[in-house]
């Protein structure tokens, strides 16, 4: 993946992305699932959308991103990596317009959905949405919320249709990155830092 110099989201985690540490368990999960279609909800600057196309993890990606600057960066980065013809960049998505923004004949059994919408997941994944995408693999970043019932309620909804496994991304393996071996612990960990205020948590939903 060739990265665009113009970054609108997460400038502090560039080193982590360059060395392959950034959300590396999610990278591996996408590779393991290996569905031909990726729907990236909250695509930001396109690390996963374009990275998955460039590495041939998927064949086509629908990237939803509400921020205009990020959509512009997505387009530029897609051209830099020569995958612009395999990418559809779409604006803000809600539970009400989601299906209208996708091809009507999309086969959701061939789809992986990756969702990172800063807490909006608790509202977006309604029972109607989940029932329609029940044959997809879904990876949702679960954000902290003061109302614990939101996470409990979402878990109850998804368990109707999916088996749920929890991914905690809190370990980075430096073994294969020899240029980091001589650094002290602080500098080495700063390089792989994603700047989080708490350990990241995702749910992987696999069809029952």
Where are these regions (language model features)?
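S-adenosyl-L-methionine
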Residues: 1-64, 72-77, 83-86, 101-108, ...
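Glycine-rich, phosphate-binding/catalytic loops in enzymes
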Residues: 55-56, 80, 129-133, 156-157
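Active-site phosphate/pyrophosphate- and oxyanion-stabilizing loops and adjacent acidic/basic residues
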Residues: 28, 152, 156
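Active-site segment flanking the S-adenosylmethionine/decSAM binding pocket
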Residues: 37, 41-45, 88-152
């Amino acid at each position: 993946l060739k990265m665009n110099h113009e970054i609108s989201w997460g400038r502090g985690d560039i080193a982590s992305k360059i060395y392959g540490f950034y959300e590396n368990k999610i990278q591996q999960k996408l590779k393991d699932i290996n569905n031909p279609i990726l729907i990236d909800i909250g695509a930001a600057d396109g690390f996963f959308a374009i990275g998955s196309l460039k590495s041939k993890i998927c064949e086509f990606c629908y990237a939803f991103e509400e921020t205009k600057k990020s959509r512009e960066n997505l387009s530029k980065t897609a051209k830099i990596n020569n995958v612009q013809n395999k990418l559809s960049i779409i604006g803000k998505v809600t539970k009400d317009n989601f299906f209208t923004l996708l091809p009507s004949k999309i086969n959701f059994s061939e789809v992986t959905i990756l969702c990172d919408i800063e807490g909006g997941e608790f509202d977006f994944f309604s029972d109607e949405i989940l029932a329609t995408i029940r044959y997809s693999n879904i990876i949702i970043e679960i954000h902290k919320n003061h109302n614990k019932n939101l996470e409990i309620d979402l878990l109850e909804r998804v368990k109707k249709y999916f088996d749920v496994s929890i991914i905690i991304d809190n370990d980075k393996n430096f073994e294969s990155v020899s240029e980091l071996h001589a650094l002290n612990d602080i500098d080495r960990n700063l390089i792989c830092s994603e700047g989080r205020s708490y350990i990241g948590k995702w749910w992987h939903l696999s069809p029952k």
